[in-house]
């Protein structure tokens, strides 16, 4: 029953990200999504990956949230179509309850991903990803500079309103 509740909370967090036009609720939705996601991964048998996932989500939100809130022109944001969000959560949560009779079957499916019984070692898995990590850092740096340039020219953003006050 606990796993079902965590899946429903993950569903609520993801729909909050998709249906909110404001960065405030999107950041909240990602944090709401990361906590039960880490819990489900720890339930499946992994111990290190959920901690890394949670820290990456929280660290990413600490970087993205100030810049996205600087760009946002709304002082008091709201979630659009909150009734649709609640309806989708109810629809998909009923689907989750009807689909999984026994969650242990799902645990056996994902057991090969979190255990040490894979054919490829972790050294081979992480060895070829160094170039992609450097490329990802460069793309995030370009996006950060772009967000700063965009927010610098706008006079009606939240941070500009606080500075002018």
Curated annotation (Swiss-Prot):
EC number: 7.1.1.2
Topology term for the membrane: Multi-pass membrane protein
Gene Ontology CC terms: mitochondrial membrane; mitochondrion
Compartment list: Mitochondrion membrane
Pfam families xrefs: Oxidored_q3
PANTHER family: NADH UBIQUINONE OXIDOREDUCTASE SUBUNIT ND6 (PTHR11435), NADH-UBIQUINONE OXIDOREDUCTASE CHAIN 6 (PTHR11435:SF1)
Function: Core subunit of the mitochondrial membrane respiratory chain NADH dehydrogenase (Complex I) that is believed to belong to the minimal assembly required for catalysis. Complex I functions in the transfer of electrons from NADH to the respiratory chain. The immediate electron acceptor for the enzyme is believed to be ubiquinone.
Family, similarity comment: Belongs to the complex I subunit 6 family.
Protein name from the UniProt record: NADH-ubiquinone oxidoreductase chain 6
């Amino acid at each position: 029953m606990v796993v079902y509740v965590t899946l429903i909370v993950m569903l609520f967090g993801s729909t909050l990200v998709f249906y909110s036009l404001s960065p405030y609720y999107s950041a909240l939705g990602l944090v709401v999504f990361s906590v039960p996601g880490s819990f489900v991964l720890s339930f499946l048998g992994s111990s290190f990956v959920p901690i890394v996932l949670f820290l990456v989500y929280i660290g990413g939100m600490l970087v993205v949230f100030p810049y996205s809130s600087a760009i946002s022109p709304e002082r008091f944001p709201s979630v659009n179509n909150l009734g649709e969000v609640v309806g989708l959560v109810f629809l998909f949560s009923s689907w989750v309850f009807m689909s999984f009779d026994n969650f242990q079957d799902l645990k056996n499916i994902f057991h090969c991903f979190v255990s040490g019984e894979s054919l490829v070692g972790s050294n081979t898995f992480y060895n070829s990803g160094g170039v992609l990590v450097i490329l990802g850092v460069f793309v995030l740096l370009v996006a950060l500079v772009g967000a700063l340039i965009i927010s610098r020219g706008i006079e009606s953003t939240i941070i500009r309103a606080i500075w002018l006050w």
